[in-house]
Amino acid sequence: MKVGIIMGSKSDWPTMKLAAEMLDRFNVPYETKVVSAHRTPQLLADYATQAKDRGIKVIIAGAGGAAHLPGMAAAFTSVPVLGVPVQSRALKGMDSLLSIVQMPKGIAVGTLAIGEAGAANAGILAAQIIGTSNEEVMAAVEAFRKEQTEMVLENPDPSED
C-alpha cells in the first residue's frame, strides 16, 4: 500500500518533496517519478493504468504551467488523484491552479493549494486516505494534528516569543 508522487519535470521536485516529507512523517511508503503529460504521454498512460495493480492507493501529481498531468493521470485510473499546482514564474501558479481545478464532470482531481502548502497538504490528505484502512497511519495523522493544536496553544499571544 503506497502513494505515487509524480511530477511534470525534475524542477517540480523542490515543491513536491514536501509531500514526500509528510508521507515520511506518517510512515507511508511512496515512490517518486517524473512523468510529463506532454513530453512522455505514453509513460503517463502506462503509469496511471498500472498504478492500482502495483498497489498504489493514491497518486499525488504536481505540475506547473499548463499542468495537465493530474487530470490526465485521473483520466487513466480509478485511483484517487490529488493535484498540486506548482508555482510558475509567469502567473505565480494561477495558470496551474486553474488548469488542475477545472476538470470536466466525471473525471475527479482533488486540487490542493498552489506551491509548497499544497504539496504538504497533499501528503497529509494522502495519509488520511490511506489511514481509513490503516490504523497506524491514522494514529500518526491524529498525533500530528494534536501537535499542531498544541503548538498554537503553547503561545497564543503573538506579541510574546
Curated annotation (Swiss-Prot):
The record's listing under SUPFAM superfamilies reads: N5-CAIR mutase (phosphoribosylaminoimidazole carboxylase, PurE)
| EC category | isomerase
From the UniProt record, give one GO term of the biological process aspect: 'de novo' IMP biosynthetic process
Reaction(s) catalysed by this chain's protein? 5-carboxyamino-1-(5-phospho-D-ribosyl)imidazole + H(+) = 5-amino-1-(5-phospho-D-ribosyl)imidazole-4-carboxylate
Q: Which GO terms label this protein's molecular function in UniProt?
A: 5-(carboxyamino)imidazole ribonucleotide mutase activity
Pathway(s) of this molecule: Purine metabolism; IMP biosynthesis via de novo pathway; 5-amino-1-(5-phospho-D-ribosyl)imidazole-4-carboxylate from 5-amino-1-(5-phospho-D-ribosyl)imidazole (N5-CAIR route): step 2/2
Return the SMART domains for the record.
AIRC
| Classification via Gene3D superfamilies | 3.40.50.1970
Q: What task does this protein carry out?
A: Catalyzes the conversion of N5-carboxyaminoimidazole ribonucleotide (N5-CAIR) to 4-carboxy-5-aminoimidazole ribonucleotide (CAIR).
- Name of this protein: N5-carboxyaminoimidazole ribonucleotide mutase
Source organism: Aliivibrio fischeri (strain ATCC 700601 / ES114) (Vibrio fischeri)
